[in-house]
Amino acid sequence: MIYRPDYVEAVKPFIDQPLVKILAGVRRSGKSTIFEMIREELKQRGVGDDRILMKKYTEMDVPENITAKQMYDELTSAMIGEGRYYLLLDEIQEVPGWEKAVNSLLEGGRADIYVTGSNSKLMSSEISTYLTGRYILIPVYTLSFREYLDFKTDSKLSRNELLDEYIRFGGFPIVALGNYEAQSAYQIVDGIYHTVVSRDIVKRHRINRQDLFDRVVKFVVENMGKTFSANSISTFLKSEHRTISVESIYNYLRWLEQAFIIYPCERYDLQGKSILKTQEKYYLSDVSLKYALLGYNRKMLDGVLENIVYLELKRRGYEVFIGKNNTKEIDFVANRRDERVYVQVCVQLPDNSDREVGNLMEIKDHYPKYVVTLNEMDTGIENGIRIVHLADFLLSEQL
């Protein structure tokens, strides 16, 4: 088991607090392993094995049509005697109404509760009803580059060679743990994707025309890091003689978000200081999904690098937007409490770097500004703007 300390550290302040700790992220991102780490942390604090109840709620682990009442009864019957129990409940979204059972357990005062899930419906209005102010959400992502290096301590490859591998193979832990050729790695990722689609989207939402759903997904993946709308997808599909309503496309995008396959990135108007509700971008929960679905192509690199930087900013707790500064675009405006950073991303700086450096120079404030590049020869400082190699950006202690 490779330790992922960031998540354990995120949980530590809330141990023994009357809050449900929710760890949510795409399937196979390592949530169950993080549970094992939390279990070890509890044991180091003196909690006995008999006081830690771990339960999986995947399709293979529980009876079909299990109810919240059955779940509650099963857990309370296992809490024998007085004292506190620690409940680690994995993939809990498979139990309809789980939040009612968890709320009752929490109100009983004897349970410290941790849950994982692979669907953002974990954060539905039902939770607002039953757990208002009584939960903390900890997003779980696939491996950062720093974590990827931890998984590869036995590798003889250089840091930059491992970065190239990370760019091509992504950060699903199961892939990083192996030593796979590209075809095998993408087969694994393709299997993860199709499991998510079949279980969390097609089956759950009763999609009849999977061919249309698959075509919408392909459009989104092909246009990763580009602005588009449901209307523009509909128009494009009409050009292929495929008919689908804009409402259906909105639903498909929402369900992909809920399953953590994609993340939306809204535009932020730096002049008006407001979020724009049109022409957002989408990024994938792991860059390997793009290659698994479309095949590897070095020409995709610009969008892939953007995706990697976007996820790194999200991991660090930033709220990430596309920046609009009059007619100029900034790849990312990232806010975290009273902090802000601006980031442009490119494979290498062109001879005329007006878009990368010039666009940032037009922003007249004191916040840090970066150009992140894959070309080490481009790095340095230009007019106060830090031009940094991708690996250095991903491994930096702070921005």
Where are these regions (language model features)?
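Short regulatory helix/loop adjacent to the ATP-binding pocket of P-loop NTPases
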Residues: 121-137, 152-153
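Hydrophobic anchor at the beta1->P-loop junction of P-loop NTPases
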Residues: 23
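Accessory nucleic acid-recognition modules appended to NTPase machines
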Residues: 180-339
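Pre-Walker A adenine-sensing motif
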Residues: 2-16
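Catalytic cores of nucleic-acid endonucleases
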Residues: 323-324, 347-391
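Short glycine-rich substrate-engagement loop in P-loop NTPases that contacts/grips substrate
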Residues: 53-83
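Conserved lysine of the Walker
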Residues: 31
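Hydrophobic positions on the alpha1 helix immediately C-terminal to the Walker A/P-loop
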Residues: 34, 38
